[in-house]
């Protein structure tokens, strides 16, 4: 049984939390995030520590308790440190370019794919085959990186495509001739 919800969240220096009727706003050096949480979970701030309390031990309350704590912790980490996902491109002629806030990908199609950066997300290109997606919201960073990856997922025969750095792609044998 997970006990994530019972863990205390420690506010780093420079991070402020405001709770107005379970609409929580977290401000930090990298920005500000706001999210509405369930009214069943009580959020208490004591100095630099945040604790969450549930009214009873029903299964539904336990799941909401753990989820709320994880989301709140991600907000605190996001505004203080930020999140990033790295993607790598493998394939002949596969490359990426930046045009303002737009990411332009050449991934073996007849046309280039363009990805507009959502609000709060930045794209970086350390080299033409590596893409770094960064921002303060873990959810939006993950969704944006997953969308970029979905434009050309790694295929199992040659491994060509866009993958997360360190991702293992299972390879298959090709057909054998007679």
Curated annotation (Swiss-Prot):
It holds the Pfam family Ribosomal_L6. Keywords: Ribonucleoprotein, Ribosomal protein, RNA-binding, rRNA-binding. SUPFAM superfamilies: Ribosomal protein L6. One of its GO terms (biological process) is cytoplasmic translation. InterPro entries: Ribosomal_uL6-like (IPR000702), Ribosomal_uL6-like_a/b-dom_sf (IPR036789), Ribosomal_uL6_a/b-dom (IPR020040), Ribosomal_uL6_bac-type (IPR019906), Ribosomal_uL6_CS (IPR002358). GO terms for cellular component: cytosolic large ribosomal subunit. It comes from the Bacteria. One of its GO terms (molecular function) is structural constituent of ribosome. This protein binds to the 23S rRNA, and is important in its secondary structure. It is located near the subunit interface in the base of the L7/L12 stalk, and near the tRNA binding site of the peptidyltransferase center. Part of the 50S ribosomal subunit. Belongs to the universal ribosomal protein uL6 family. This is Large ribosomal subunit protein uL6. It comes from Streptococcus pneumoniae (strain ATCC 700669 / Spain 23F-1).
